């Protein structure tokens, strides 16, 4: 506050808000909003029954709001000064960094060539498309909840449901055997459909399909029964001890 001022600017705003004469707070030894909020609301009202009277509660509330705002601004300025001081102590060597990697960055025109033709409509702006398709929200939530554990969903069910023969021995089968193998695949229901749905291709020779989509010249799916081959051709990784087995002896992908 300026030494030549009797009332702070913040307190002057309170006077204006309650329609009090300018400088009236100073007559009662209130020179800033902090002089007011040093008292509780009740204490301030009781000490100033003669003035401002019924407006005492509103005056205290406004003063408290101004005081909180000033505190926030003060702390923000302090933090800004500290951050700037820290940055000044840390030299920026960005000009010395190699820019060789910049050439490998894909431009937006290459990453999203469809943007130029998109209409500015609600679906184009707000539609959320998962990065991994097909997407199954419940399965994704289960996988996320088990992400930091060494236990799979199959292990959890096998420990809690010993009535499933498959969990007791691979040679024992029952009504839930196929379901148990589906759990072991760690694929969502929609993902399991891809390798298990019937072939709807009218072509008798699928060599071109496998060569185009999976990079191997073969007439059927049998080379991909080997996990390493399947993962390598799809450029995917399998967690240690994991499997991408769909649980069926014939996992021919649909065309």
Curated annotation (Swiss-Prot):
It holds the Pfam family VRP1. Coiled coil: none annotated. Disruption phenotype: No effect on virulence in mice. The keyword Glycoprotein does not apply. Keywords: Plasmid, Virulence. Disulfide bonds: none annotated. Part of a Salmonella virulence gene cluster. Belongs to the SpvA family. In Salmonella spp. the spv gene cluster is encoded on a highly transmissible plasmid. This is Virulence protein SpvA. It comes from Salmonella dublin.
């Amino acid at each position: 506050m300026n030494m030549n001022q009797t009332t702070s600017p913040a307190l002057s705003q309170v006077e204006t808000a309650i329609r009090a004469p300018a400088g009236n707070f100073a007559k009662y030894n209130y020179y800033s909003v902090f002089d007011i909020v040093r008292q509780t609301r009740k204490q301030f009202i009781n000490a100033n029954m003669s003035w401002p009277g019924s407006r005492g509660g509103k005056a205290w509330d406004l003063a408290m709001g101004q005081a909180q705002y000033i505190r926030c601004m003060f702390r923000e300025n302090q933090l800004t000064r500290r951050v700037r001081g820290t940055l000044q102590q840390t030299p920026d060597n960005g000009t010395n960094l190699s820019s060789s990697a910049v050439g490998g960055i894909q431009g937006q025109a290459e990453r999203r060539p469809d943007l130029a033709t998109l209409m500015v409509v609600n679906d184009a702006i707000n539609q959320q498309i998962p990065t991994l398709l097909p997407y199954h929200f419940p399965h994704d939530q289960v996988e996320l909840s088990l992400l930091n554990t060494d236990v799979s969903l199959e292990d959890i069910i096998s420990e809690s449901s010993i009535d499933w023969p498959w969990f007791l021995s691979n040679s024992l089968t029952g009504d839930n055997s196929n379901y148990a193998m589906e759990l072991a695949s760690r694929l969502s229901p929609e993902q399991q459909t891809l390798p298990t749905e019937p072939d709807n291709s009218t072509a008798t020779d699928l060599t071109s399909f496998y060569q185009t989509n999976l990079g191997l010249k073969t007439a059927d799916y049998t080379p991909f029964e080997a996990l390493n081959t399947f993962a390598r051709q799809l450029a995917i990784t399998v967690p240690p001890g994991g499997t991408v087995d769909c649980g069926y002896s014939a996992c021919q992908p649909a065309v």
